[in-house]
Amino acid sequence: MPGRLKQVRQVFLDMDGTIYHGGTLFPTTIPFLDFLKERGIGYAFLSNNSSFSTAEYVEKLRGMGIESGPENFYTSTCYTIDYLKRKCPEIRKLHLFGMPCIRPEFEAAGFELTDTEPQAVVVAFHRDFHYRDLCRA
């Protein structure tokens, strides 16, 4: 490996448009992941798309031939949870506008999801989101 690559210990890969497009894995993805494994370089997958849960991403990649566990994913949902815990640890009650699939991740992180008296409002991708809903929150 070239000198600078010898120092690399971890690679972070966006998913849609980087390792696959839609439901089609790029032909270079598996060889690249094998290249990393052979050299002891770890990798993790990133996404700013909150319309899928981490578990759904794990299954999506498994269906494309990539075996990886939830610990190898960092999504916008993960980031939001981490941000709230780090910057606003007093917040426990959330009003969540987002796809139903991400609700369990917030609940597993210890947040109570409520429509009444939330301490914070989280707005993520939701196919049925309307401005009037945000006004009611």
What are these regions (language model features)?
Residues 1-15, 19-137:
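HAD-like aspartate-dependent phosphatase fold
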